[in-house]
Amino acid sequence: MKYLIIGLGNIGSEYHETRHNIGFMVLDDLAQEKGVTFDLKRHAHIAEVKVKGRTLILVKPTTYMNLSGKAVQYWMQEEKIALENILVITDDLALPFGTLRMRMKGSSGGHNGLSHIEQTLASANYTRLRMGVGSDFAKGQQVDYVLAPFSAEEQKEMPDVLKRAKDAVTGFATIGVERAMNAVNTKK
């Protein structure tokens, strides 16, 4: 069975390890753990990992965040992956840093990357892993906040956050979305 795991982020070194790129960070960490590297292909950097007999196709769109749907749609069709086997990893300002929430469907919550995916796929019925990045910013400073690096304190906690996110990704593919949601949504 194949799964499409999309980590949202922006390409370019200036965005490396910023809050908005936490989706990329999860996939980078998973690829490193599995000893694979990403290759630049159409609309994305792609890597493939095997987990308990399942194939996870890791996708880091090169279309910039607000056009992520283009890469998702292309790789979904290219690999012939059903909507229920897609997981999108994204940052979430509404959740405290380190909090993870997995949902089988839902709204974009104002997230432009998710909005474009929903618009392109004509559906919001795909699983998403929302990763809390906090909301410690002044009114009107949201863009600067998500494009800024994590604080020193947050960086200390990042290995644990990434481990829990990787566990959520592999759980999605191996134990199913319902059980993965139970495991993810009951932990901090």
UniProtKB/Swiss-Prot annotation:
Binding site for tRNA: 15, 64, 66, 112
InterPro entries: Pept_tRNA_hydro, Pept_tRNA_hydro_CS, Pept_tRNA_hydro_sf
Organism expressing this protein natively: Cytophaga hutchinsonii (strain ATCC 33406 / DSM 1761 / CIP 103989 / NBRC 15051 / NCIMB 9469 / D465)
Name of the featured protein: Peptidyl-tRNA hydrolase
Active-site residues annotated for this sequence: 20
Marked site positions, Discriminates between blocked and unblocked aminoacyl-tRNA: 10
EC numbers, comma separated: 3.1.1.29
PROSITE patterns recorded: PEPT_TRNA_HYDROL_1
Family of the protein in this entry: Belongs to the PTH family.
Lineage: Bacteria, Pseudomonadati, Bacteroidota, Cytophagia, Cytophagales
Name of the top EC class for this enzyme: hydrolase
